[in-house]
């Protein structure tokens, strides 16, 4: 059982360690002109793509889903680009650099949620939905209440994730490029706005694809050079790393980072089910033509991400060997210059010189841009499509809906920049964990049960969904991170760091209880409509494909 809990603790990197890769203290570096030039090349190229995409965005379908004309392979790359963050690249390699084998367990944890998406969600989601996951959740339930709940769940997740990314972006750019924090945050905000405002999903998709290719190429080159150094022998790699690491052979033993099994289980469940409830990831399944391409998307994305996280393990051990043992990368106190999160960046310099260092720094920045662009589009679609067009202004024209979407992009952008500046010196690592917990406690139960449970009713979905969302937020506030570290109280009311285990349970129990006890005529009608929904979800009959999507 202990080993199972240890494996489930794989969620830790994203919600804590990896998030902390770009939220902890940073030491500003000298201006890196190679990195700045390479980043400018990336920006000019992607802005060119945005201009090209803007000429092809003529309808609501084009803006939200790129007309449904993205292939499974392209979408798989874009999903990988949307999901592989700078935090995972720098944070996981730093975790391997400091803790060895535990980093592998943690890096593989990023993949745990994807089989659920592949086998349970991707096909039915594409067959039932159109632009957002709320289309699926409200297929046979009452449109208004369900869309409001889904939009609120999406916006809270997007806001928390976006703040974490913006603060992380500012600190990472300060770290890598030597630019001022506030300039960095504004720069990310402006570029994010331009990609989404003018190019919609088509530009966002290609930015994510390019970023994924660059990141995979950079990580592959680093791993290749590390393995070349040890004669392509993993035995030599591990032997040399153990010889120079302060912990010695202990870096090859698991379990050093897992203390509390309840927190480990809670965090593991948060990542597993949270991944399947992230709105910017779910939105990507509507960019392909049919369910077959949706399945292929997940298959390719999982392959790309699995390959990448294995590379981070090699990069981390390479950093132990080539960076940790090299005094040139240490300060006077013997600590790594810029902190442990610079391990992968220093390794880039060690294996490829200053030019490759510039390339990796630029890729890290590109990584952030790709993630925030996807988040912004997901947030804008929740407001314009779910709330405006289907709740507050039913019958709105496509033009009106797109106008609201673009206004929302501007508002989200300004809010993200302001909050990025305000949260500069705050601990933002908990925000990513809370985003996953809310996605797992609100979005995921409603999506899953709306597609699979015939007895679900609007009353059950509403009460259970809101209970899950509020439980996650309240328990997070009462937990050690916010109640003690941020608010300064002596002892936490809720003893565990992450609430997913409890909030997911509350959500599922609430949905089950309030649906099972719903004997209204409306509830019975919704149950009767499940068969028609089931046939549509299995066959795709009635789904519009391609540009008319």
From Swiss-Prot:
Example GO BP: sodium ion transport
Keyword Mitochondrion: no
Entry keyword set: Cell inner membrane, Cell membrane, Ion transport, Membrane, Sodium, Sodium transport, Symport, Transmembrane, Transmembrane helix, Transport
Ranges per topology, Periplasmic: 1-32, 99-102, 169-182, 235-260, 326-361, 424-427, 485-493
Pfam families recorded: SSF (PF00474)
Record's GO cellular component terms: plasma membrane
Cellular localisation: Cell inner membrane
Lipid bilayer topology: Multi-pass membrane protein
Main location: membrane
GO molecular function terms listed in the Swiss-Prot or TrEMBL record: acetate transmembrane transporter activity; glycolate transmembrane transporter activity; symporter activity
InterPro entries referenced in this protein's UniProt entry, alphabetically: Cation/Ac_symporter_ActP (IPR014083), Na/Glc_symporter_sf (IPR038377), Na/solute_symporter (IPR001734), Na/solute_symporter_CS (IPR018212), Sodium:Solute_Symporter (IPR050277)
HAMAP family: Acet_symport_ActP
Family as reported in the entry's similarity comment: Belongs to the sodium:solute symporter (SSF) (TC 2.A.21) family.
Function per UniProt: Transports acetate.
Protein name per the record: Cation/acetate symporter ActP
């Amino acid at each position: 059982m202990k080993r199972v809990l240890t494996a489930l603790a794989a969620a830790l990197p994203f919600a804590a360690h990896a998030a902390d890769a770009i939220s902890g203290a940073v030491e500003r570096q000298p201006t890196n002109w190679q990195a700045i030039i390479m980043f400018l090349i990336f920006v000019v190229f992607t802005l060119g793509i945005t201009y090209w995409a803007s000429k092809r965005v003529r309808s609501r379908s084009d803006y939200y889903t790129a007309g449904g004309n993205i292939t499974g392979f392209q979408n798989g790359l874009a999903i990988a680009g949307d999901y592989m963050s700078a935090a995972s690249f720098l944070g996981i390699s730093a975790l391997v650099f400091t803790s060895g084998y535990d980093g592998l367990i943690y890096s593989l944890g990023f993949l745990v949620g994807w089989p659920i998406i592949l086998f349970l969600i991707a096909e039915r989601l594409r067959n039932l939905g159109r632009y957002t996951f709320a289309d699926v959740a409200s297929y046979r339930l009452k449109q208004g209440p369900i869309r409001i709940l889904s939009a609120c769940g999406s916006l809270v997740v997007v806001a928390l994730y976006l703040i974490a990314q913006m603060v992380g972006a500012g600190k990472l750019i300060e770290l890598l490029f030597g630019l001022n924090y506030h300039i960095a945050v504004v720069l990310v905000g402006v570029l994010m706005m331009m990609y989404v405002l003018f190019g919609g999903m088509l530009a966002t998709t290609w930015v994510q694809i390019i970023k994924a290719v660059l990141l995979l190429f950079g990580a592959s080159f680093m791993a290749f050079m590390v393995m070349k150094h040890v004669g392509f022998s993993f035995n030599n790699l591990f032997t040399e790393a153990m010889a120079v690491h302060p912990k010695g052979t202990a870096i090859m033993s698991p379990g050093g980072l897992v203390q509390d099994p309840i927190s480990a289980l809670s965090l593991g469940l948060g990542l597993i089910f949270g991944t399947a409830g992230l709105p910017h990831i779910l939105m990507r399944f509507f960019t392909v033509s049919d369910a077959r391409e949706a399945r292929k998307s997940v298959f390719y994305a999982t392959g790309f991400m699995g390959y990448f996280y294995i590379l981070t393990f090699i990069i981390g051990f390479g950093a132990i060997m080539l960076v940790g043992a090299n005094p040139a990368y240490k300060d006077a106190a013997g600590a790594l210059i810029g902190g442990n999160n610079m391990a992968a960046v220093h390794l880039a310099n060690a294996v490829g010189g200053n030019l490759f260092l510039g390339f990796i720094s630029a890729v890290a920045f590109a990584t952030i841009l790709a993630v925030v662009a996807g988040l912004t589009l997901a947030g804008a679609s929740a407001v314009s499509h779910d709330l405006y067009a289907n709740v507050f202004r039913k019958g709105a024209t496509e033009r009106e809906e797109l106008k609201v979407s673009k206004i929302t992009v501007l508002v989200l952008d300004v809010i993200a920049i302001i909050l990025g500046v305000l949260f500069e010196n705050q601990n933002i690592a908990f925000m990513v964990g809370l985003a996953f917990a809310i996605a797992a406690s609100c979005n995921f139960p409603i999506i899953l049960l709306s597609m699979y449970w015939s007895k679900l009713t609007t009353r059950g979905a509403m009460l259970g969904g809101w209970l899950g969302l509020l439980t996650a937020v309240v328990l997070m506030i009462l937990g050690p991170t916010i109640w003690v570290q941020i608010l300064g109280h002596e002892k936490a009311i809720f003893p565990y760091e992450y609430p997913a285990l409890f909030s997911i349970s509350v959500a599922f129990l609430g949905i089950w209880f309030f649906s099972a006890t719903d004997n209204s005529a409306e509830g019975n009608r919704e149950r009767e409509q499940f068969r028609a929904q089931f046939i549509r979800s299995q066959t795709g009959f009635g789904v519009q494909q391609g540009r008319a999507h």
